[in-house]
Amino acid sequence: MNVRQHKASFFSVVITFLCLTLSLNANATDSVLEAVTNAETELGARIGLAAHDLETGKRWEHKSNERFPLSSTFKTLACANVLQRVDLGKERIDRVVRFSESNLVTYSPVTEKHVGKKGMSLAELCQATLSTSDNSAANFILQAIGGPKALTKFLRSIGDDTTRLDRWEPELNEAVPGDKRDTTTPIAMVTTLEKLLIDETLSIKSRQQLESWLKGNEVGDALFRKGVPSDWIVADRTGAGGYGSRAITAVMWPPNRKPIVAALYITETDASFEERNAVIAKIGEQIAKTVLMENSRN
């Protein structure tokens, strides 16, 4: 074989390898997005996904710049705002909030047990709303930071120009199609979650506290947690609202690697609660399969 033939053969091998690698990566990425589009068809829904693998830099996005109802995923942001105020010396996490039965709204499984007693600290209220999605606890947290507009102002201050909260629980869950109130986009939420739980927007202590509350979520077992391997650590917040809205935001740590940050929103569907939960679990499973496939190659 002469030099020219040798070079041609070498470049042919290189090009074939690169094409195969790109093809495998594309197929891995597309399998997640295919799961989302299949879910849209199955549910007759509008679904938005943004996910970022911080280990590899891989991203998955589907309708990631479209607005979706926040529902209870705002509760992570509200508690992060409290923690930032604590970091700045403007608030105490042990400050006690007292309330009566007249202050409660629908679905208050924790706060209803504390009516007429000594009250609950801001830390206890955040734990209640992030673990059980207690709506009254969320409203008390909103009161502590200055209301929905104050939360939106906090988000603008950390670079989120998209997410907005306009109302209180439970009205914010109305989720009328086309209404921009109380909405976010999947990509905005993922970016904000990274700032709050990964970057240095909050102190280390506050990041660890927020992460701990989210890991203690008691109402997310049928969603991403069901779809990913049992040895993954998941810190998540779920949500549900009108017009078939269902949501989950999560940071998921596979063993011995950086996490995946994800936001998945479903709306405008007549599918049952169980059907919506099932497709979220299925999408989470596909993300996990793709990540594990990447790990096996490295």
UniProtKB/Swiss-Prot annotation:
PROSITE patterns: BETA_LACTAMASE_A. One of its GO terms (molecular function) is beta-lactamase activity. Residues 1-28 form the signal peptide. It catalyses: a beta-lactam + H2O = a substituted beta-amino acid. Substrate binds at R237, T238, G239. Keywords: Antibiotic resistance, Disulfide bond, Hydrolase, Signal. It is an enzyme of class 3 (hydrolase). Disulfide bonds join C79-C126. GO terms for biological process: beta-lactam antibiotic catabolic process; response to antibiotic. The active site is at S72 (acyl-ester intermediate). It comes from the Bacteria. Belongs to the class-A beta-lactamase family. Hydrolyzes carbenicillin. The class A beta-lactamase family has a specific amino-acid numbering system, sometimes called Ambler or ABL numbering and often misspelt as Amber. A multiple sequence alignment was used to derive a consensus sequence and then the consensus was numbered taking into account insertions and deletions. This allows use of identical numbers, e.g. for active site residues, despite differences in protein length. UniProt always uses natural numbering of residues, hence there appear to be differences in numbering between this entry and some papers. This is Beta-lactamase. It comes from Proteus mirabilis. The gene is blaP.
